[in-house]
């Protein structure tokens, strides 16, 4: 293990934890579960994971690692009791991550512990994915164990307006930057080859602006930037039970778009000269788009956009140049059921924000929060368009968004440099 990685292990795990890992001996297939405030669900999730790993015993010794990301309920005690019921043949380790505890440190601790155990294959899982099934673990591990992939991403079936932050910003921008057409940049689970973990950690494990909430984004970006062999696996519907109260939209943007922008700076040599995009091999059924149970109301979204145009204009003027603003002004005249914020304009807005973030024109938290009304405007426009589109043609809307971001990249690169 490189000296830098060893230092991080010491920073993340106490000596007793390192000793326990050393005594565990080599483990070939590791499942790492990061958890926060899931006392009511975590045992079911962990039992599913352990049961799935038992079926991989032919691939070598298996084990489960659990790291807490700062629970405020009884989760640590529940996890500790579960881990103590393990056996030498299928060990369970509860990693006591040194404070400050958060999701990012928990994920990195799991990766480093898996590396120390000599894992050939790992699966990372967010315990918020309470709908996890045994076949999910198999699907994520098999391409790695067969040496067909270095990094395995999930893909899900979803409703039209589900995951709009991913479909309208995170995935299109990632595709344009790194050239891979992936559905999820932070899908809550992933499969990894043990051989790639060390180099990725060595290059980017130091605490950066992607922490504490962008560790999944960092991992996916590291895979894309290193030209790792990628595979997507269709897992069906994504069922999530969040642990604890959920933040407001502006905070969500700070925690997701912020890390994505920060990683653009860290990995700029990997994307500045890259053009075009290509599909990633996908296993399993097609990821169908299902009808929404009820149509989302766009009136409040459009009202938020209009208020942003009125109240945040002095801030936006420091982020977006006049040509972009001039295209936004007329949108205030549109009724909610006729609202339009076309993908090319939206891609230009995101590009302007990325450049302003990179140049530190404003405090970054303040800048990202100013994106919220614009994002709501884009979601409203997406919903209005989707209502007028047959269900089987919804993927064409997603593709139109993706291509708009690809077309915007040349302009982004010119200003970034």
Task: Place the predicted regions along the sequence by residue.
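N-proximal low-complexity "stem/linker" segments adjacent to membrane-targeting elements
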Residues: 1-51, 410, 417
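Short beta-strand/loop segment that forms part of the nucleotide-sugar
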Residues: 58-71
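Short beta-strand-to-loop acidic/aromatic patch adjacent to the donor-nucleotide binding site
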Residues: 119-130
